[in-house]
Amino acid sequence: MKNTVCTALMLLMSVCMYAQELYGEYEKKVYVSSQGDSLKYRLLRPEAEKAGKKYPLVLFLHGAGERGDDNQKQLVHGGQMWLNPVNREEYPAFVLAPP
């Protein structure tokens, strides 16, 4: 029983670490208004960002399956699409993902 619990915990920890690596390129940010209200969001910058060049802003609005307030669930399905190296090269953009 003890070995089963240890194995399950190790598996869970490895999955959590993989998720952090997967979305690591998305910067964790927090907007704070002048009234003190805050909004967490994730920002993905263009891979080869050049100073002075303009890039489009993609506002990634997720569905109900990705709702939450942990600032990571919103990336579960569509967030991977923007990390694809081909997409990042072909469509350089800022990707903003609120929770």
Question: Locations of the language-model features?
Answer:
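Bacterial Sec-dependent N-terminal signal peptides
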Residues: 1-22
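Active-site machinery of serine-nucleophile hydrolases
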Residues: 57, 61-99
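Intrinsic low-complexity, intrinsically disordered segments enriched in polar/basic residues
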Residues: 13, 51-53, 97
